[in-house]
UniProtKB/Swiss-Prot annotation:
The keyword Metal-binding does not apply. Pfam families: VPS51_Exo84_N (PF08700). The gene is VPS51. This is Vacuolar protein sorting-associated protein 51. Residues 77-93 have a biased composition (Acidic residues).
Length: 164
């Protein structure tokens, strides 16, 4: 909760589409990849070789890069999105079959996106609040300028009434 609000635009807001495409690519590779068994075997071998938590995190990142090297066209991405909508039951089964490391990767990516979205919302609120303060100050200046003119008019009217 100790996050700072900045009026600057988030640098990663533009990369949301890239992240979404990356996740779709990874999901697409998991569904249709013929080497799936070999990759899971590599994950198991790397997990047994790793001795510390830092090495395990590094291994997870290496496997993620291996899954995303293959370029995917926009048509394939839209087809994947349709498959996701239609086959929610299939997705649940695939999630149950994923290795723990992969689930942690997906969880971390989702948390990162959530944090990014929250920061974007906070930045927007801050910018709007800042603009509201500026408009409020401007309106105060305008009303104060009018009050001086109104006071002069009152004095003039009072002096005219006294003369009559």
């Amino acid at each position: 909760m100790a996050e700072q609000i900045s009026h600057k635009k988030s640098l990663r807001v533009s990369s949301l589409n890239k992240d979404r495409r990356l996740l779709l690519r990874e999901f697409y590779n998991l569904e249709n990849e013929p080497n799936k068994g070999r990759q899971e075997a590599r994950i198991g071998e790397k997990a047994s070789e790793a001795h510390s938590g830092e090495e395990q995190v590094t291994d997870v990142n290496i496997d993620t890069e291996a899954n995303t090297e293959k370029p995917v066209k926009d048509d394939e991405l839209s087809a994947t999105e349709e498959d996701l909508k239609e086959g929610s039951e299939d997705a649940e089964e695939e999630i149950k079959n994923l290795p723990f490391k992969r689930l942690v990767q997906i969880h971390n990516k989702l948390l990162g996106k959530e944090t990014e979205t929250n920061n974007s919302i906070k930045n927007t609120i801050y910018e709007n609040y800042y603009d509201l303060i500026k408009v409020n100050d401007l309106l105060k200046e305008i009303t104060n300028a009018n009050e001086d003119q109104i006071n002069k008019l009152k004095q003039t009217v009072e002096s005219l009434i006294k003369e009559l």
